[in-house]
Amino acid sequence: YEILRCLVGSEMCIRDRYYERINGQTVEIELPLEYPNSWILLRLKDVCQLTDGEKRNGKGICLDAKYLRSKSSASIVEKGKFVYAGDNIILVDGENSGEVFPVPQNGYMGSTFKQLWLSSVMWKPYILAFILFYKDELRNSKRGAAIPHLNKELFYNLPIGIPPLAEQQRIACQINNLFQLIK
């Protein structure tokens, strides 16, 4: 909570509830955090989506988790779901479901990934920091007995506070600075 106070600054508020229309009824939703009055509150599904990527044929690098973690060399595949350098992809199958990777070069996503589409009105590092904040919760609430899958219902329904863009940039910068101190 103190880190949140540090990141938000002096504009703390007592807004820890909001109302949402569900099946035609207005329901009060209790929130895990307090949000400043200048922020709007949405669900993660309103600012990001999991997509399949563009189906393509032709040789390209397979961007699987081992390669993205630098634990294996690149393998070449003939077709797949194409993503571009600078995109973000998220593991949706396996024990590390919810882990996000930046795409280092054009190539084909590994079969355990989805492309993470982020709204252009959002500051990408802010949303990525938000998803990272919930990494353990996403990892520990997987679905499926044989191969666990990302709980997409939980993922899409996470409440996210949306500050003005300049505040998103400041918060993301502060989070980055704090992570540098941890390293």
For the regions a language model picked out, list residue spans one by one.
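Extracellular/lumenal ectodomain signal focusing on beta-strand-rich modules
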Residues: 46, 115, 157-159
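Short aromatic-glycine-enriched beta-strand elements
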Residues: 59
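Generic recognition of stable, solvent-exposed alpha-helical segments in well-folded globular domains
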Residues: 34, 39-43, 78-85, 122-129, ...
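Short helix-capping and inter-helix turn/linker motifs at the boundaries of alpha-helical repeat units
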Residues: 21, 103, 146-150
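Single conserved hydrophobic/aromatic residue that forms the stacking wall/gate
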Residues: 1-9, 14
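Non-catalytic DNA-recognition/assembly elements of restriction-modification systems
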Residues: 5, 22-55, 67-68, 161-183
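A short beta-sheet element
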Residues: 68-69, 79-132, 144, 155
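Specificity-determining recognition surfaces
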Residues: 131-160
